[in-house]
């Protein structure tokens, strides 16, 4: 909702200010200039990126406007899933994990936490790295190194669409100047026309410059930034899993290992340690009652 509101404010501010200065709205409609700028921009995106990145770019851009923030319930389910998995190891040993991590989609434990099981990448990351831990013969330091490399690779791949969009956005003023120069060339072909005719051609050329700058700073720049922030939010859950596993292998008790992961959750949605204790105590009471 905030993204839609922000977009409305941008358009209202730019066009509203132009209208307040008695600007002619019809002069802003220059299809030829828009074709030049959009064609150059879209073409450069296609030339510079593989189709996988382009597809992910569309998905991430759409997700900016329909994305639901991972709230407290998501964080609770993530932390309690990690707690239950580690408790399963404490009670039944590493072999007890097999029934859950081999086919996590069919695991009763994973299905207890639907917000996590809906996140395929996150669930696969949890299952794969608990499986790695279950194989044994790996130290906390080695696991931390492996997971850090994996997360770096994932971040690089997931951030590529926003980086590509940002670079193209930075080029849009240049494409606007390109369109403006072509407009001036057309104007020079009518140099013997009336002052009004020459003025209209110059105005059309300047609209190209305006459109390129508008796309850069009012659309593509903010959109690429929002895409990057969304990816960083998603990666924070993976960082939580990594830290929890490393702390467990380092010999920390289950609660402290999960709390180490809790500290990597984003500040505005991070539950307090007391909340984690309450959730764990409720789980322990239910398990004892059963």
What spans do the regions from the language model cover?
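Structural signature of hydrophobic alpha-helical transmembrane segments
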Residues: 3-7, 32-34
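Helix-termination/interfacial motifs at the ends of transmembrane alpha-helices
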Residues: 5-8, 12-25, 143-146, 150-229
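Large intracellular
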Residues: 19-161, 233-290
